[in-house]
Amino acid sequence: MFDILVYLFENYLHAAACPESEQLARKLSAAGFEEDEITEALDWLSGLRAIAVSPLAKVPQPDSIRLYAAEEQAKLDTSCRGFLAFLENAGALDPQTRELIIERTMAVDGFHVNLHRFKVIVLMVLWQQEQPLDSLILDELLTDEAEELAPVLQ
């Protein structure tokens, strides 16, 4: 599923440029993705679209502190929660977008959500909302933790 999400980000500048689900499924199949992966990714994106257009029940105040439920802590490890706090403190996210990211992370089934996958979720939520991204934040989202840990040889 995550490979498909990255593929969509790389191939469609804006979420609005994405074709309808049936046509997109055919294009993804032609690109070599498996049917079950396509279905899972399209279902996840459909959930993102549905929740993005419906207002959240309670919009957090900008100066509020986010406490995570036990299920959220189990799904979002400390590196993911720390990265989310970093983005919010940097001004890249508002509280409503943060909640949308958490909701979409909780909607991921069958995968351990490591920091790399979490960055893909964040990227897709911001892509769907067509929010402008600072180039340093975008670089941070596109950087894989394996690249960060790789030794620099000169």
From Swiss-Prot:
Any Pfam family hit = DUF494
Q: Which InterPro entries match?
A: Smg
Instruction: Output the superkingdom of the source species.
Output: Bacteria
The family assignment reads: Belongs to the Smg family.
Which PANTHER family is this protein grouped with? PROTEIN SMG (PTHR38692:SF1)
> This protein is called what?
Protein Smg homolog
